[in-house]
Amino acid sequence: MCICHVCKRPTFLDHQGSQHPGAPFGAPVGDVPEASVSQLYEEARRATAAGAYTAAVLCCRMLLMHIVVAKGAAENQTFLAYVEFLANKSYVPPEAAEWIDHIRKRGNEANHEISISPRTDAEDLVAFCEMLLRVIYEFPARAKRRGGGLSGAT
């Protein structure tokens, strides 16, 4: 047993060299004002680290719903309506629409079918959600702290 140098909590390596509990997948994202959004993202990160990949995929699906409602969409819409809201309000670049649709499809599979989500799906979706949170929350907050723009911008 060891003590993690980051969180200062106990951790151990099993006979295969795997760390338990594992470090959360992805990186923390700052400046997210909605507690539910931040909590769901962290839950998806921890679920991925724990090998609970289907749970992580479902968290990412729910996370997108929370983001969209926080940004002004009506509650109790279809997931497709939420995906379209993100695209129509330019919260994601056109090239990212394919990723949003990927989350929709993987989330639907995990939510409505008898299936198990693989590690790759969970990691891809958490990484996409991390990027989305940075674009929607973290980078605008950074710019605001710097006085509304980045230094050297013309």
Question: Where is each model-derived feature located?
Answer:
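Charged alpha-helical initiation segments
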Residues: 1-53
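Charge-enriched, short contiguous segments at helix-coil
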Residues: 98-105, 109-154
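Short, charged amphipathic alpha-helical segments flanked by flexible coils
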Residues: 20-21, 69-106
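General structural signal for alpha-helix termini and helix-helix connectors
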Residues: 43-46, 50, 69, 88, ...
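Alpha-helix boundary/capping and short turn/kink residues
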Residues: 53, 73-76, 115-119
